């Protein structure tokens, strides 16, 4: 198919050389399917994140916050293992194959999660396995990012990546929001005896995520087509094209990839995902300890808070698309890291007020929490609330106030989405027109490794030493990321700019 110039109007910019109108419409339909796939991946993680802790306690009373860290990390561990594999697969075969396979795994794993209460023993292990398989299914994020990077020109890419991040944020919003709505089903819910399924506030979100997955499989099969363009917008043959897709093949792209910049980008992405995984994991236990919320209150209120952060993120992505065109990607990345640092600094405990303590007697039975002032009788509950006395730091660590918590949420809600979209947008530009499947697999694995280590780190650190030490350590990590970005600032440039093909 000969290359020809488009008209003035393109989906995101004007005056670029692309293929004919039908092919271009097909290209953007396929990119939108990738947006939905990213949305599904985000929903698969967040739709249960606020209810994992109370669900875990319901199926196994002996589970502690340390095991919660492993359950949350299991998703990311599965994604970390699967991402390079799916990325390699997508470099050599049509992307439909790894996408359909991964989404099917995701659907099956969410159904498995809905049944983890059923076995007579080892329920917490079943939950761990279910979340691991959900994570393996989410390994297709590498395929999604490499597809969007390869199907957009250099000028289109920041906007396309911001759109993809907005879809990810929408999943981030709808996940906790749906969990908050479904919390009204209650812990008992409805029993479907024929298939031995309990539909309640813990299982309904996972079942809904499975339904989204079925829709996604149909879209991938019926709508997705392989498309690829170079940095200037010229259509090229994808490395994994099928014979019926006849396109002109340009000369081999000359120039090497800056592997130091690639390594730096992976480290920065790891840190960005690590610190947000810490924030996601600790929100429910922290709020239950500091604000004496019940399990149901923690699920509802944190669901609302995380949904609000998601809406904030979408606004951030809209602003980022405009601002990045004026100031560039790197200044936005640096600014986002500074906001995250301030957000975690706000979470450090100050003052001389202390949280309500949840005491236990010598038989390990819970005693109602200490009340420092008279409270209405309606506040008391059979469910133990407050900061557990077995966490010794509860006795001497000042309380974190709700205003601190909300302010921190707002700051991190601006800083994280900015860093997220800028980091992998920069990464895709550094790689240039080379096949990106494997490289995106490593980037996704890097982020998944962060999501694996982050929850384990914070659950142990928080349980043993408390929020003061946990959040001080996070502030130190963010500061190290700021220093690294500043030191490598000049190397983090697009492939075509580095080789002088496009002016910066």
Curated annotation (Swiss-Prot):
Give the record's membrane topology. Multi-pass membrane protein
One annotated GO molecular function: chloride channel activity
- Gene Ontology cellular component annotations, sorted alphabetically: lysosomal membrane
Q: Which residues lie on this side of the membrane: Extracellular?
A: 54-66, 119-123, 191-203, 280-302, 352-468
What does the UniProt keyword field contain?
A: Glycoprotein, Lysosome, Membrane, Transmembrane, Transmembrane helix, Transport
**GO terms for biological process, alphabetical:** autophagosome maturation; lysosome organization
Glycosites: 364
Which InterPro entries does the UniProt record give?
MFS, MFS_dom, MFS_Domain-Containing_Protein, MFS_trans_sf
Residue ranges of the TM segments: 33-53, 67-87, 98-118, 124-144, 170-190, 204-224, 259-279, 303-323, 331-351, 469-489
Q: Which stretches are Cytoplasmic in the membrane topology?
A: 1-32, 88-97, 145-169, 225-258, 324-330, 490-504
List where the motif Dileucine internalization motif lies: 12-13
Where in the cell does this protein reside? Lysosome membrane
Q: Tell me, what does this protein do in biology?
A: May be a carrier that transport small solutes by using chemiosmotic ion gradients.
Sequence similarity: Belongs to the major facilitator superfamily.
Protein name per Swiss-Prot or TrEMBL: Major facilitator superfamily domain-containing protein 8
The opening ranks of the lineage are: Eukaryota, Metazoa, Chordata, Craniata, Vertebrata
Encoding gene, per UniProt annotation: mfsd8
């Amino acid at each position: 198919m000969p290359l020809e110039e488009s008209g003035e109007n393109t989906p995101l910019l004007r005056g670029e050389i692309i293929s004919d109108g039908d092919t271009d419409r097909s290209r953007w339909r396929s990119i939108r399917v990738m947006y939905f796939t990213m949305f599904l991946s985000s929903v698969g993680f967040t739709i249960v994140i606020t209810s994992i802790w109370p669900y875990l306690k319901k199926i196994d009373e002996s589970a502690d916050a340390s095991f919660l860290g492993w359950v949350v990390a299991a998703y990311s561990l599965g994604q970390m293992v699967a991402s390079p594999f799916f990325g390699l697969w997508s470099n050599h075969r049509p992307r439909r194959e790894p996408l359909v396979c991964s989404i099917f795994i995701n659907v099956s794993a969410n159904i498995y999660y809905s049944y983890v209460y059923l076995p007579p023993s080892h329920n917490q292990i079943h939950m761990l396995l279910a979340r691991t398989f959900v994570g393996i299914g989410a390994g297709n994020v590498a395929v999604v990012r490499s597809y969007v990077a390869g199907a957009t020109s250099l000028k289109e890419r920041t906007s396309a990546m911001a759109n993809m991040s907005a879809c990810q944020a929408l999943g981030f919003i709808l996940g906790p929001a749906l969990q908050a709505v479904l919390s009204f089903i209650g812990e008992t819910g409805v029993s479907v005896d024929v298939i031995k399924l309990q539909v309640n506030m813990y299982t309904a979100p996972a079942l809904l995520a499975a339904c989204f997955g079925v829709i996604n499989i149909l879209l991938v099969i019926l709508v997705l087509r392989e498309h690829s363009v170079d940095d200037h917008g010229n259509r090229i043959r994808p490395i994994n094209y099928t014979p019926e897709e006849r396109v002109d093949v340009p000369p081999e792209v000359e120039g090497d990839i800056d592997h130091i910049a690639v390594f730096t980008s992976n480290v920065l992405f790891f840190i960005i995902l690590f610190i947000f995984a810490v924030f996601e994991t600790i929100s429910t236990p922290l709020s239950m300890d500091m604000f004496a919320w019940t399990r149901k209150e923690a699920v509802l209120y944190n669901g609302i808070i995380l949904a609000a952060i998601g809406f904030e993120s979408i606004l951030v992505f809209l602003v980022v698309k405009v601002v990045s065109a004026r100031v560039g990607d790197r200044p936005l990345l640096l600014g986002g890291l500074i906001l995250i640092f301030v957000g975690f600094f706000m979470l450090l405990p100050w003052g001389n007020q202390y949280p309500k303590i949840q005491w236990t007697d010598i038989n390990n039975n819970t005693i109602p929490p200490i009340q420092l002032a008279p409270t209405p009788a309606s506040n008391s509950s059979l469910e133990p609330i407050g900061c557990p006395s077995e966490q010794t730091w509860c006795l001497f660590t000042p309380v974190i106030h709700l205003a601190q918590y909300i302010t921190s949420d707002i700051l991190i809600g601006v800083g994280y989405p900015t860093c997220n979209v800028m980091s992998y947008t920069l990464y895709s530009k550094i790689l240039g027109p080379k096949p990106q499947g494997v490289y995106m697999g490593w980037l996704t694995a890097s982020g998944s490794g962060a999501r694996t280590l982050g929850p384990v780190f914070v659950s142990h650190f928080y349980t043993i030493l408390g929020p003061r030490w946990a959040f001080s350590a996070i502030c130190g990590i963010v500061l190290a990321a700021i220093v690294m970005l500043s030191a490598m600032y000049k190397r983090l440039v697009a492939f075509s700019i580095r080789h002088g093909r496009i002016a910066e």
